[in-house]
Amino acid sequence: MADESERLNKPISTAELERRWQAVRKSMEAQSIDVLVMQNNNDFMGGYVKYFTDLPATNGYALSVIFPRDEGMTVIGQGPFGADRMLPPEGDGVRRGVRRVMSSPSYSAAPYTKENDAALAEKALEAYSGATIGLVGTGALPSAFVDYLRRGKLSNAKFTDASDLVDDIKAIKSAEELDFIRATAIMQDRCMDAAFKAMAPGKKDIEVAAIAEHTGHSFGSEQGLFMCASGPVGTAPLQANRHFQNRTIRQGDQLSLLVESNGAGGFYTELGRTCVLGKASQEMKDEFAFVIEARNFTLKLLKPGASGKDIWETYNEFMRKNGRPEEKRLYCHGQGYDMVERPLVRFDEPMKLKANMVVSCHPTYALAGSFNWACDDYLITDRGCERLHQFPEIITELG
């Protein structure tokens, strides 16, 4: 392989990419799938493309990957008409394992371009007109893209959903992936600390969140979600995105901040805490203590072999027993290249937990006088859960 470009932000090793390709191709062979097709258009929940290529999809621009069982990949992205380039076996220093690069100037905001990328994919798949084609991430593949492939020159091919095939491999983290994830968690500890230190009367919520984001950028973070909300102690301000972060902070206010960003290399974790410009109320302290109790109750359930359904039902029974609201949100889920990835702790998740999965756990509920939560990431092991963040498990009082 050619040396990676010096412009790349913390690339994964080629050995790790080859491990993934080998594992996926072994499963493809076992399931008689000849080629995989996937597409993402963002690096919040666009992890499939990143997993195979180490290149993020960004800005709403579609990035499609065709992954054959027996040869290099084809990558289709935004660019000039007619671009169709074959790469040498060693790659070009950026695209590893990629045989062919194609492009078109297509955009989701211009619907008449909806078949441009599909036409290129059809061209790249011409050798698979009678093959079995696995679609990966069917929740992200545009219907126009798939419909074009099904009705055109590939109409005799068999199409199957191969998302589970990839998810079963992608959800279990390698040693190298865990090194990246640990670094993301420590970065977020620093983001939270910097944001809380910048908290002051007269600042807007968005300014405090921006401190967390900027701190992450200084450690190589490329993307993230920074939700927050301030309000007087004795109320329950619900954290929200930037459009709702215009409130001016006052002395005595509380602020809840979620730092859900990727680190250098693209892996996500998330950290959530509350701080107060003054003193927390007794209700806030009591409910935070219960949140930690509920979180610890969940952690004991996060064992290899456990099911999302059983955890969901057992946790809600615990909440009812203790007079707290049942959880109807997604309060515990996997993370990796996707901000939210499988397994999900829900009543309908078929994937069982396994060792070396990384999950975020964030019990959350609002009462009339308090917004109650905590959020950290954990590594599931055969010996229990290891907390990856190191930020104190407290409500931070700033004066």
Residue ranges: model-predicted function:
Residues 1-399:
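Active-site neighborhoods and metal-handling regions in enzymes and metal-associated proteins
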